[in-house]
């Protein structure tokens, strides 16, 4: 009864399609957030609940959905692919699309890198962020640059594998955590470590705990946090 009477309802797409509480219900507007991670059939199912508007919000260059299925080739194509919003040649456009092309979060150097290599130079940085750029670097061990690459190729640090096939690398984990600790000691309230592999995230998380450091959980604003790319996204 509560869901039927509510003017605004928030739910996951899985619950929307599987929970009988939504049977027969429709809404004037349906907003689908993080749409790049959804299967197209899920978006169609959500759209079926909208009587007037379906708004899809997401990043056409983020990771697509993951599928373990015989139909994975189809399911792993996101809505932006099906609508041909991004054609892979640097052209983005669709009569239905509104692009939010000004970013307010990243250091300008990071945004410029993403803009050049991912968004065909369409991403811009807001002026206040540009003006405070040097302030963002003050607590970094390498305060002259917002972007640093550390080459481990000469350290003989081979990856290990779990039974499920996920990778982990002890040396890489130690160095990543050392960098995070250095930034934390220099005054950064929160430091995030991102890795492609769940096993590596678990390894670094355990290192953080073993060293007695504060492992930043969801909802807190200080400490060191490590997760996979998909978990962050």
Q: Where do the model's predicted regions map?
A:
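Conserved helicase ATPase core
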Residues: 1-6, 71
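Conserved helicase motor core of SF1/SF2 NTP-dependent helicases
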Residues: 14-16, 20-233
């Amino acid at each position: 009864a509560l869901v039927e009477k509510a003017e605004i309802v928030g739910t996951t797409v899985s619950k929307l399609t599987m929970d009988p509480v939504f049977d027969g219900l429709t809404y004037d507007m349906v907003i689908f957030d993080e749409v790049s991670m959804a299967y197209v059939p899920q978006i169609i199912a959500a759209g079926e609940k909208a009587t007037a508007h379906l708004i899809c919000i997401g990043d056409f260059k983020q990771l697509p959905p993951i599928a373990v299925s015989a139909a994975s080739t189809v399911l792993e194509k996101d809505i932006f692919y099906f609508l041909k919003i991004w054609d892979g040649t640097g052209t983005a456009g669709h009569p239905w699309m509104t692009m939010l092309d000004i970013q307010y979060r990243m250091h300008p150097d990071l945004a410029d890198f993403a803009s050049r290599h991912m968004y065909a130079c369409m991403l811009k940085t807001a002026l206040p962020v540009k003006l405070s750029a040097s302030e963002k670097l003050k607590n970094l061990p390498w305060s002259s640059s917002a972007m640093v690459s550390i080459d481990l190729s000469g350290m003989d640090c081979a990856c290990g594998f779990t039974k499920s096939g996920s990778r982990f690398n002890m040396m890489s984990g130690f160095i990543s955590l050392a960098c995070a600790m250095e930034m934390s000691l220099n005054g950064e309230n929160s430091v995030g470590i991102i890795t492609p592999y769940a096993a590596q995230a678990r390894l670094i998380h355990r290192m953080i705990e073993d060293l007695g450091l504060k492992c930043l959980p969801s909802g807190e604003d200080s400490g060191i946090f490590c997760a996979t790319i998909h978990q962050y996204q």
